[in-house]
């Protein structure tokens, strides 16, 4: 891939890439837009080639759209191994988590990795339990870091010429705060992250509300990394 011309013309994924402004709008951790964008890649069996595509919400959540598309477009034996990586602008809701769990139960040799930019309604217990169920099912769930943002930019975005390297314009602190909340979800702790959006200003405010259970069960270095301790 040439950094002088953007994605090369012969790139077979070019028509499936999204535009830079779409990537910024969907994956900005300070923007709480309702729509969800999914960037995904699939690797079949021991093959080295990776199949990439993108998707967005329609009348249904993008996770449901992916599952139906994946299961209807081709048949593969249950013994076939497949690795799927999702880069989501929002983590799955509780209902989508159930659908994902059912999908994985029917395809035991599928491995799923989820990288999310933000946590969807993270104070809703149904969503929190859904993420825990996915983790228990063996799904790896992480908050996107600079590394994932740069990877998505190079592989899913029709970036401008001479602009192959991407640096998120979002504060690294937001990533750490979402990661801390995901850690709380994994441990079954109550929410510690408060997010408010003031409609009269284009700003999103993050605040920690730590309880004694958080201090008791979360390692100090993880709390210190937020910069709030």
UniProtKB/Swiss-Prot annotation:
List the InterPro entries: APOBEC/CMP_deaminase_Zn-bd (IPR016192), APOBEC1 (IPR041547), APOBEC_Cyt_Deaminase (IPR050610), CMP_dCMP_dom (IPR002125), Cytidine_deaminase-like (IPR016193)
The record places domain CMP/dCMP-type deaminase at 10-134
MF terms (GO), sorted A to Z: cytidine deaminase activity; RNA binding; zinc ion binding
Query: Mind naming one GO cellular-component term on file for this protein?
Result: cytoplasm
Q: Classify the source by domain of life.
A: Eukaryota
Q: Which Gene3D superfamilies match?
A: Cytidine Deaminase, domain 2 (3.40.140.10)
Cofactors per UniProt?
Answer: Zn(2+)
Q: What is this protein called?
A: C->U-editing enzyme APOBEC-1
Which lineage ranks, top first, belong to the organism behind this chain?
A: Eukaryota, Metazoa, Chordata, Craniata, Vertebrata
């Amino acid at each position: 891939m040439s950094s002088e011309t953007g994605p090369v013309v012969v790139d077979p994924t070019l028509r499936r890439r999204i535009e830079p402004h779409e990537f910024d709008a969907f994956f900005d951790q300070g923007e709480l837009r309702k729509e969800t964008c999914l960037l995904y890649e699939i690797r079949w069996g021991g093959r080295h080639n990776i199949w990439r595509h993108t998707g967005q919400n329609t009348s249904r959540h993008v996770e449901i759209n992916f599952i139906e598309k994946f299961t209807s477009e081709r048949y593969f034996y249950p013994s076939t191994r497949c690795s799927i990586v999702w880069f989501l602008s929002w983590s799955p809701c509780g209902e989508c988590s159930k659908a994902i769990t059912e999908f994985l139960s029917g395809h035991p040799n599928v491995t799923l990795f989820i990288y999310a930019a933000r946590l969807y309604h993270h104070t809703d217990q149904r969503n929190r339990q859904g993420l825990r169920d996915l983790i228990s099912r063996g799904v790896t769930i992480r908050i996107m870091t600079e590394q994932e943002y740069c990877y998505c930019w190079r592989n899913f975005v029709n970036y401008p010429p001479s602009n192959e390297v991407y640096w998120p314009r979002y504060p690294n602190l937001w990533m750490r705060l979402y990661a801390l909340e995901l850690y709380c979800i994994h441990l079954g702790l109550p929410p510690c992250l408060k997010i408010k959006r003031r409609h009269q200003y284009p700003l999103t405010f993050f605040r920690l509300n730590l309880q004694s259970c958080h201090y008791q069960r979360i390692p100090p270095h993880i709390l210190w990394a937020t910069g709030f301790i």
